[in-house]
């Protein structure tokens, strides 16, 4: 065979595993233990050298990513890494909640053979998918395949070595989003263009699909899905940025910076080592230069970033980002002025 079949299954999901073993009787495959989102936290992500794309929001609900989605994404990513390290030419990746046809390997052999004949530059081919913009697809270009537009699902697909290498090279592990969102982004077929800048996309991933799906999600697949039904991640530590102006490293500024470090607050000192031209606050207005520093800094930040702007020379922080953000959210306002009592 010119491919290796991988089945992604959570260790605690014994029933799904046993069903897939029966469905794949007579086939050669590797049962791959999935990364369990229930066992992940920010410390385990750090140990894995993995980071979330904190700016990502679900395009339909606006929520953050779930721990189950992170586990799913890492499960697929780990297979890519394994195949690249072991020079596996083609990987067939199946999730454990799909129905598959009989004589799967024979069908896959024919699909890969036809892919190589019809489309020399293919890198990923869906075996099942949920097309979102099917009206944009040219179904007459190829006999057995279609060059896809924006599509969902990663429950069954073929990906070759070049495609897996592209995903690894994209810096995906430092900007994790759901698995079925990253593929359209890397293929330059996602409508969510704001996220493209976070990935190294030198050449788009060449994504196709079989015209007639050969695998289908089980009828209750989404009801029992760990990705859909797991805990939404609160981005407290990553969402808050403390901004303060300080042109000279005085004792007061050192105390302020030290207090930020004690409470684990991400902070940025604006204007450090810049000549102060704003005047003496004791004798008259002196804030104009601060505003200019702030405007320049805001231009480089994401629109979703939560910011605390504060003085520095006569201020120390006395709460962590989670507590500050919870108090900020309790106001139910985008901007809160004179919020000293809520923050320090």
Residue ranges and their predicted role:
Residues 12, 214-215, 247-249, 274-275, ...:
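Conserved beta-strand elements of beta-rich interaction domains across eukaryotes
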Residues 83-126, 293-344:
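GT-A fold catalytic core of metal-dependent nucleotide-sugar glycosyltransferases
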Residues 28, 259-282:
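Active-site catalytic motif of lipid deacylating hydrolases and related acyltransferases
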């Amino acid at each position: 065979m010119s491919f290796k079949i991988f089945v992604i299954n959570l260790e605690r999901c014994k029933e799904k595993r046993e069903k897939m073993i029966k469905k794949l009787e007579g086939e050669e495959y590797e049962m791959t233990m999935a990364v369990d989102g229930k066992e992940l936290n920010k410390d385990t992500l750090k140990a894995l050298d993995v980071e979330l794309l904190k700016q990502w929001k679900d395009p339909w609900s606006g929520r953050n990513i779930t721990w189950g989605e992170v586990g799913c994404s890492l499960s697929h990513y780990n297979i890519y890494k394994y195949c690249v390290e072991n020079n596996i030419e083609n990987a067939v990746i199946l999730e454990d909640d799909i129905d598959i046809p009989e004589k799967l390997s024979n069908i896959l052999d024919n699909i890969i053979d036809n892919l190589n004949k019809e489309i020399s530059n293919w890198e990923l081919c869906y075996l099942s998918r949920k097309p979102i913009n099917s009206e944009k697809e040219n179904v007459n270009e190829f006999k057995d395949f279609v060059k896809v537009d924006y599509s969902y699902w990663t429950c069954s697909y073929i990906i070759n070595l070049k495609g897996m290498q592209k995903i690894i090279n994209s810096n995906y592990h430092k900007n994790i989003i759901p698995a079925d969102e990253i593929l359209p982004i890397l293929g330059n077929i996602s409508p969510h263009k704001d996220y493209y800048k976070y990935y190294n996309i030198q050449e788009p991933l060449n994504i196709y699909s079989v015209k007639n799906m050969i695998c289908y999600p089980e009828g209750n697949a989404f009801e029992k899905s760990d990705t859909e039904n797991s805990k939404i991640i609160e981005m407290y530590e990553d969402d808050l940025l403390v901004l303060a102006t300080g042109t000279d490293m005085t004792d007061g500024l050192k105390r302020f910076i030290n207090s930020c470090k004690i409470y684990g607050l991400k902070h940025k000192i604006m204007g450090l080592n810049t000549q102060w031209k704003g005047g003496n606050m004791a004798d008259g207005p002196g804030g104009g230069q601060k505003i200019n520093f702030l405007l320049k800094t805001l231009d480089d930040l994401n629109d979703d970033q939560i910011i605390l702007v504060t003085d520095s020379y006569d201020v120390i922080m006395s709460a962590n980002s989670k507590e500050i953000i919870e108090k900020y959210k309790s106001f139910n306002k985008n901007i809160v002025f004179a919020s000293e009592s809520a923050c320090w």
